[in-house]
Design a protein with these regions (language model features):
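Terminal, regulation- and interaction-focused segments at domain boundaries
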Residues: 1-12, 59-62
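Glycine-rich, often proline-containing surface loops adjacent to acidic residues and nearby aromatics
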Residues: 51-57, 95-101
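A generic structural motif
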Residues: 60-64, 103-110
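Short, internal acidic amphipathic alpha-helical interface segments
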Residues: 60-96
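Long, hydrophobic, amphipathic alpha-helical segments used as structural scaffolds
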Residues: 84-87, 129-141
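Long, contiguous binding/interaction regions
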Residues: 101-103, 109, 115-127
Length: 166
């Protein structure tokens, strides 16, 4: 089965960035692992050729115990409220936190820069939330009632450093 133009552009974008990736056989899917400031970020890019949609999903390396899911759900909800692009999700059954960003491209206009930007955004957002997830998950179960997510989110020491200007 031939690749869609959008998947070809996605492959080209990954190659242009010199990113190491794996193609999933029989699907228009790329998987990759990125080293970010706080964590390693597994990433999944799926292309839907006919509607010309690319969906990028990055996964947090921290699995959330059921005992801590309410506080993590609050963190995600409050974080999503501030986002302009994409959203965080919590798989309630598995305790997996993901960041998903999707773009619908006009037919005939598969922009590799946009594809690379979607990947960068997903990695950056997972990296940004990772230390906050860690703080929640390290809180002993009996102390969760004392944890104020709004106060946790104000902690600047948990944010990665701002990128150096070029």
């Amino acid at each position: 089965m031939p690749h869609s133009a959008l998947f070809a552009a996605t492959l080209s974008a990954f190659k242009a960035q010199s990113w190491v990736f794996r193609e999933v056989p029989g699907m228009e899917v790329i998987e990759a692992d990125f080293e970010a400031h706080h964590t390693k970020v597994p990433l999944h890019v799926q292309v839907y050729g006919d509607p010309n949609i690319a969906s990028v999903v990055a996964r947090a390396s921290t699995t959330v115990p059921k005992t801590h899911q309410i506080q993590v759900a609050e963190l995600i909800m409050r974080t999503n409220k501030e986002l302009n692009l994409g959203n965080f999700e919590l798989d309630w059954d598995d305790g997996v936190v993901m960041f998903r960003v999707t773009n619908i491209f006009p037919h005939g206009h598969q922009d590799e820069r946009i594809l690379a930007s979607l990947v960068h955004a997903a990695i950056a957002e997972i990296d940004r939330i990772t230390p906050f997830l860690g703080e929640i998950c390290r809180t002993p179960k009996g102390e969760l009632i004392l944890l104020r997510v709004t106060d946790l989110m104000k902690r600047q020491d948990l944010l990665p450093p701002a990128p150096a200007s070029e």
